[in-house]
Amino acid sequence: MTVSSAPGKVYLFGEHAVVYGEPAVPCAVERRAAVTVEARDDDRIRVEASDLSLDGFTVEYGGTADRRPDVDVPASLLDAATGYIDAAVEQARDAADAPDAGFDVTIESDIPLGAGLGSSAAVVVAGIDAATRELGVELEKTELADRAYRAEYEVQDGEASRADTFCSTMGGAVRIEGDDCRRIDTPNLPFVVGFDGGAGDTGELVAGVRALREEYGFAADTVENIGDIVRRGETLLSAADPGADPTEDLLTELGRLMNFDHGLLEALGVSSRTLDNMVWAAREAGAHGAKLTGAGGGGCIVALDDTRETETALRYTAECENAFRAELDREGVRVEEA
């Protein structure tokens, strides 16, 4: 039996634009998905999902992704527990040259599903890591990140970027631009996350931005402007003292860029009333900046605030189901005690 875990993430800047080759800076945070894998004597896959929502479930099915199990659970849960695990298992089988390997898989996660915190990436990264180790193979992190990206790319019908899976694998803050992925040094960023209890449809939201970008030149310019924000933010981060507490001036400038970024994402149609209300609640509470994180449409916002004010304000905001501090996770994927 092998247990691996991987962190979720927030986007400091750059979601959606990263799909079109612009840079993005996602940051791993201390909310994790853990995947326990135990090899079987046959090629079947048994998936037990818990802590993904209020209801857990267990399914067992043949060793390929050709059939969708007939279980009465939300599609998002089913995709998390079977679609992504199937893709992770196929990558592990390929890496270990064990095409007929079967597994009992248990998923436990404290990352909200579909909320912009990289839940699927964390499950895939941890799943591949645990399954390959269970088969006696230990992957380098760069290969693990690449295989996790390929798994997400398959499940998301070619709409995935490398950002989530690379960030979850490596930990810390990373910079993504096309296939160029690398860690960057940052100070300790004081993230606060607000969750509205919902989840956007990533595929529909990405397709919506694509349609706007193809129809309107100014929408394409908006995507490029998000890339400019990322580059400016990266310049600020590179001049800061890595690992130290950030200065107020740095937080002010980063927050201003986050506010610009949210405005552009809103213009691209990927925000929502609940996300906007949480963003404004955070700003009015004194956050240096706040924006949606992830695909949008519902889910989470991220704010920069080193005080308790933003978290408290979000907890009293009607649209916010949960609010919590999310420290930067510099470790990435790791093996847990079984």
Label the predicted regions.
Residues 5, 10, 108-131, 287-305:
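Glycine/serine-rich anion-binding loops at beta->alpha junctions
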Residues 1-19:
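Short, Gly/Pro- and small/polar-rich lid/capping loops
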Residues 78-183:
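Gly/Ser-rich oxyanion-binding loop with an adjacent helix/lid
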Residues 17-21, 26-28, 118, 158-171, ...:
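FAD-binding core of FAD-dependent oxidoreductases
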